[in-house]
Regions:
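N-terminal secretory signal peptides that target proteins for export/translocation
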Residues: 1-9
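Bacterial N-terminal signal peptides
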Residues: 13-22
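Serine-esterase "nucleophile elbow" of acetyl-processing enzymes
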Residues: 29-117, 122-144
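Structural recognition of the beta-strand scaffold that forms the well-ordered cores
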Residues: 68-73, 110-115, 147-153, 188-193, ...
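Oxyanion-hole/transition-state-stabilizing segment in secreted/luminal serine hydrolases
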Residues: 78-86, 118-170, 174, 179, ...
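A general structural detector for well-ordered alpha-helical segments in enzyme core domains, enriched
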Residues: 97-98, 169-176, 180, 206, ...
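A structural motif corresponding to the C-terminal end of an alpha-helix
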Residues: 106, 179-187, 216-228
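Catalytic His-Asp segment of secreted/periplasmic serine-dependent ester chemistry enzymes
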Residues: 196-279
Length: 279
C-alpha cells in the first residue's frame, strides 16, 4: 500500500517553497519594470491640449497681425496639423501639406488653425465667444485680423443628434457665422461645404441637405457682403456621387491625398478672390 512519510513530506514542501520563493525573488530582482499604470497622471484629452496650444499661440505670438488665414472647425480641420494618425498606424493626415502652404510667417497664406477634434457646433461657438460674454475668447485679440476665415462645421452634430438633424446643424452654423463676423468684421468668411462620408444615407439625409441650405444662406442679405460658399463636396465624390474612399482614412477624415486636393482648391479660390479685389 502506498504511504507518505510525514517527515519527508513536510521537508519536501519546505524545500519546494524555498526554491520557488527564491526563484520568484530572483525574477523580481532581475526585472522590476515601472508601469505607467502605477504612476499618478492627470488625464489630458486631445481637445484639452489643443485648447492650451491655441491659447499659447495667441499669448506668445510676436505678431498676430501676420496671420492672413484663420481655419475654424472640428477634427477635419484639426487634422491639417497631424502627420501620422496617432490612433491608427500607417495613416497620414495633412501636416506636410499644411507646412508647405500655410505655415510660413510673412507669406500671404500664413494661417492659424483653431480646429479641435470632437468639437460640435456649440463647442466652437463657446470658444469664439468673447471672454466678457462667458466664452474662451479665442478671437478676442484685436491684433488677430485675418483676411479670410475658412469654416467647416457641423458633421459632429449628426451623431447623438437633435431632430431634425439638418435644422440643428443649420442653426448652429448660423450662430457661429454671426459670432465670427461680430469678432472679425473685416474678414471674408469662406463657408465650406461638409465633405461626403462613407454613409450613403447620411450623405443624402444630412450632408447634402445641409450643404444646400448653406449655399442659400450666403446669399441672404445679412451674409451676402462678407460670406462666400465654397463647395468641396464634388471634389471628393465620383461620377455617381459616391465618396472616393482613397481620399479618406476612415470614411470621414481626409488622408494626405485628400488634404492636398482640398489645399489646391483653397489656393485656387484665394488667387481668384484676390484678383477680383485688386480689380
Amino acid at each position: 500500500m502506498f504511504s507518505i512519510n510525514p517527515f519527508n513530506f513536510r521537508h519536501s514542501v519546505i524545500v519546494l517553497c524555498f526554491v520557488v520563493g527564491g526563484l520568484g525573488f530572483q525574477l523580481q530582482a532581475k526585472s522590476s519594470p515601472t508601469f505607467a499604470s502605477s504612476q499618478a497622471v492627470v488625464r489630458v484629452e486631445h481637445w484639452q491640449k489643443r485648447q492650451v496650444d491655441i491659447q499659447r499661440f495667441l499669448s506668445e505670438s510676436k505678431d498676430l497681425s501676420a496671420v492672413k488665414l484663420l481655419f475654424v472647425g472640428d477634427s477635419i480641420t484639426d487634422f491639417w496639423l497631424f502627420d501620422q494618425n496617432p490612433w491608427v498606424s500607417g495613416q497620414k493626415f495633412g501636416r506636410r501639406i499644411w507646412d508647405e502652404t500655410f505655415a510660413k510667417p510673412g507669406s500671404e497664406n500664413y494661417a492659424f488653425n483653431i480646429g479641435i477634434s470632437g468639437d460640435r457646433l456649440e463647442h466652437v461657438l463657446f470658444r469664439i465667444l468673447p471672454k466678457a460674454h462667458g466664452g474662451l475668447g479665442q478671437l478676442d485679440s484685436p491684433q488677430l485680423n485675418p483676411e479670410f476665415i475658412f469654416v467647416m462645421l457641423g458633421i459632429n452634430n449628426s451623431w447623438a443628434a437633435e431632430q431634425p438633424v439638418a435644422d440643428s446643424i443649420y442653426e448652429g452654423v448660423l450662430a457661429n457665422l454671426r459670432a465670427l463676423h461680430a469678432r472679425k468684421p473685416n474678414a471674408r468668411i469662406v463657408l465650406q461645404s461638409l465633405l461626403p462620408t462613407n454613409e450613403v444615407a447620411k450623405n443624402k439625409d444630412v450632408v447634402t441637405a445641409v450643404n444646400q441650405r448653406l449655399k442659400a444662406l450666403v446669399l441672404q442679405p445679412e451674409f451676402l457682403k462678407f460670406t462666400v460658399y465654397l463647395d468641396l463636396y464634388p471634389l471628393f465624390t465620383d461620377s455617381k456621387g459616391v465618396q472616393i474612399s482613397s481620399y479618406f482614412t476612415d470614411g470621414l477624415h481626409p488622408n494626405d491625398e485628400g488634404y492636398k486636393i482640398w489645399r489646391d482648391r483653397l489656393l485656387e479660390f484665394l488667387t481668384q478672390s484676390r484678383t477680383v479685389r485688386k480689380n
